[in-house]
Amino acid sequence: MTTPTEFQFTDYQPYDFANRRHIGPSPAEMTDMLKVIGFNSLDGLIDATLPPTIRQKAPLVWGAPMTEREALDKLRETANKNKVLVSLIGQGYYGTITPPVIQRNILENPAWYTAYTPYQPEISQGRLEALLNYQTMVCDLTGLDVANASLLDEATAAAEGMAMAERVSKSKAKAFFVDADCHPQTIALIRTRAEPLGWSVIVGNPFTDLDPVDVFGAIFQYPGTHGHVHDFTGLIARLHQAGAISVVAADILALTLLKSPGEMGADIAVGSSQRFGVPVGYGGPHAAYMAVKDAIKRSMPGRLVGVSVDARGNRAYRLSLQTREQHIRREKATSNICTAQVLLAVMASMYAVFHGPDGIKAIAQQVHQKAVLMAKGLEKLGYKVEPESFFDTITVDVGHMQGLILRAAVAEGVNLRKVGETKIGMSLDERTRPATLEAVWRAFGGNFTIADFEPSYLLPKGLLRTTDYLAHPIFHMNRAESEMTRYIRRLSDRDLALDRSMIPLGSCTMKLNATAEMLPITWPEFSDIHPFVPADQALGYREMLDDLTEKLCAVTGYDAFSMQPNSGAQGEYAGLLTIRNYHIANGEGHRDVCLIPTSAHGTNPASAQMVGMKVVVVKVRENGDIDLDDFRTKAEEHAASLSCCMITYPSTHGVFEETVKEICELVHKHGGQVYLDGANMNAMVGLSRPGDIGSDVSHLNLHKTFCIPHGGGGPGMGPIGVKAHLAPHLPGHPETDGRPGAVSAAAFGSASILPISWSYCLMMGGEGLTQATKVAILNANYIAARLKGAYDVLYKSKTGRVAHECIIDTRPLVDSSGVTVDDVAKRLIDCGFHAPTMSWPVSGTLMIEPTESETKAELDRFCEAMLAIREEARAIEDGRMDKINNPLKNAPHTVEDLVGEWDRPYSREQACFPPGAFRVDKYWSPVNRVDNVYGDRNLICTCPPVESYAEAAE
């Protein structure tokens, strides 16, 4: 019998989120990694990596870090301060039912929400098919030829529609007409977009105030924000006669019952797909849509999924016409948008797949019937209801009773819309119940039930839809939930996301999106709040926004933040507008020159162009640093008109430049402001603050540094932080402070995903965030050290260090073996990895960012794969392997390759199970290498006909 030993207390913390859950390497592994790099301590590595001049003086501190349970309790306490009423406010945001099969298997599934933008098509086939379904759905419902894979929100899409109209219009006019019945936030964003570009905006009644000769385009709301349903066919014909372009902002659910914009002759249709199963979420995120006529498709902004073939001739999907995008076209791009809303577009497309055309039409009919019943009840009470015909929205003039009725409705648990000083509006939706109608009638003084009225239709007969939609078999095959679940699973199995392996994309920060951070976004206290509810119903949101703002200010050294921008690119746009407005307020509106280094993100020059700035390009030295002499020369040359500079720190080359403070001082000396792109903030948190370095404004990518998942290409969040002197010029919003300058449809952007970043901050604490930054730098330097000798690291600091990412040079392989960077990327798929960022910021290179969340084992697996690829290239160099028919040129290999006839001069095992690949759980690419040229030359952007599915199966 053993003698009991004395009980020993331990300091082990099983629920230490920062060190045990978020940060990948253990302390012992960090010690081993540091030895490989040549350091005895993590702090020693950090001291050698960051210039002392940019280090922050005080540590990042804010309370003790919380455990997951403590953080969730805090989130629950905060969420309970929001009041969840039934909101009939409408105005572009409507109650909807998210089918549980979609919520559980897509919204809450890391296979969908942790994926990256599908720039590597072979490992994105599932997402690309879902997005092709989305584009098909939009084309069918709008009656137009080509749709993109989503935009940020409806108001942004409308502003993009205006910009596109100006590009393709034959008119020389510099004015754009806006239907006064557009949603107020849409009008606000159009004004914001137009003003810096010198376009005037005319708001009025299109049937009385529009002269097509005076404008390059016009936008009409269909149905209108107050419910009117008009046929714009005649107006559109008149616009075309004058060489102008027509844009129709259409309710996607109404289009199941109403004549499509395409049938009216519209050139462009925009709108939101939110009411296809995506919660309102206090403003977002939601997927906006844009569809256009075929003749103008190459001028359309955003991503476009198309059909191509792979190396075997099998059908494959890819992003088409990428040369339009900002990362290639820079200031000549159609837009600065590089973020779509993929996760939300996928949800909306699956809503259509789940319900099919009959189901969606039935939902629309039921919504309309509810609106008719509501109108009948109000008319019985003696109120005049407008308009006479409508889809889901009505307006009632109640005179001096407005305030009393609005308060009475709130007491009944219902929010109605305040319209002017005497009217009340209401929009019925999928979630409206009979009890809600009866509650509204009581607020108006009635006391009857829904059984007192007969349902009927009040849609204008001349506008009833007669054309089919959603005819493709995909919208008819998944009625049973068993089939729907399997379809979603089949698609997700075709993709490679963070739930399978690390995604080492440079400048993308694909870190852990912890489950505890994700849980609150589906709580109704966050997801079911309309963005325009009275302030006292969103006190929980207010508390969270204030605390997150305070934390972000502490991280950055800024004094104020705007949470409005829905993406990093939109943050750039908002930040540059803030700078522009600051100069105008100081009587220096002539300052319009923006200095941008050649190494900058492509969004930087595209954003500068959007706010009317002139881009002056600054050279970069051979070592990757900004050429200080060239910068000084150009700053002095343009001193009288210098507005700002845009720099990224650490640089896009993955190095902390030592001259950054001097650059900031030069800009300030000549009257400009400094915009520091926050894309690489994951290398700075807790160690260095942009506001201390000399920057005036930055955006933060919350979908990078602060754990919001990339969602396969969106959602994102790009809030901007500013120093105090710029704070008065931050974006306003018509529904909050009434100030101009709105950049998003909702005042706080995609507010419902902010709990992710907030809970990350709560669980990490200041010390944990700082440690995460240090480990991100450690992991990048470890990879650089492991790959040394096989690949050159292109840029290092004077001390031989990289920041949180490194660029390896694969260009020598082209001359020695014929192996391209594309070959390396596709071979990594065979190893089970998403490729690092390809050919940016330097063509023919790979930029690797491992983040702090990856374990040493995963880093080693990646390094083994990269080293094995180098050995395969060496075999080609030595003549041991054919220069054309080899594993690199034929990658990725599929199951079809494995089981088919094999006539290649290397083995099946070498092809399919290279070092780094799992044998039991191997990821198999569903297609061989995709033919990009074929896809652009034979552009198909909707679901292929059913015959092609049969052909593909043969």
Swiss-Prot record:
GO terms for molecular function: glycine binding; glycine dehydrogenase (decarboxylating) activity; pyridoxal phosphate binding. Pfam families: GcvP2_C, GDC-P. SUPFAM superfamilies: PLP-dependent transferases. The modification N6-(pyridoxal phosphate)lysine is found at residue 704. Coiled coil: none annotated. It is an enzyme of class 1 (oxidoreductase). It catalyses: N(6)-[(R)-lipoyl]-L-lysyl-[glycine-cleavage complex H protein] + glycine + H(+) = N(6)-[(R)-S(8)-aminomethyldihydrolipoyl]-L-lysyl-[glycine-cleavage complex H protein] + CO2. InterPro entries: GcvP, GDC-P_C, GDC-P_N, GDC_P, PyrdxlP-dep_Trfase, PyrdxlP-dep_Trfase_major, PyrdxlP-dep_Trfase_small. Keywords: Oxidoreductase, Pyridoxal phosphate. Its cofactor is pyridoxal 5'-phosphate. It comes from the Bacteria. GO terms for cellular component: cytosol; glycine cleavage complex. GO terms for biological process: glycine decarboxylation via glycine cleavage system. Its EC number is 1.4.4.2. Belongs to the GcvP family. The glycine cleavage system is composed of four proteins: P, T, L and H. The glycine cleavage system catalyzes the degradation of glycine. The P protein binds the alpha-amino group of glycine through its pyridoxal phosphate cofactor; CO(2) is released and the remaining methylamine moiety is then transferred to the lipoamide cofactor of the H protein. This is Glycine dehydrogenase (decarboxylating). It comes from Rhizobium etli (strain CIAT 652). The lineage of its organism: Bacteria, Pseudomonadati, Pseudomonadota, Alphaproteobacteria, Hyphomicrobiales. The gene is gcvP.
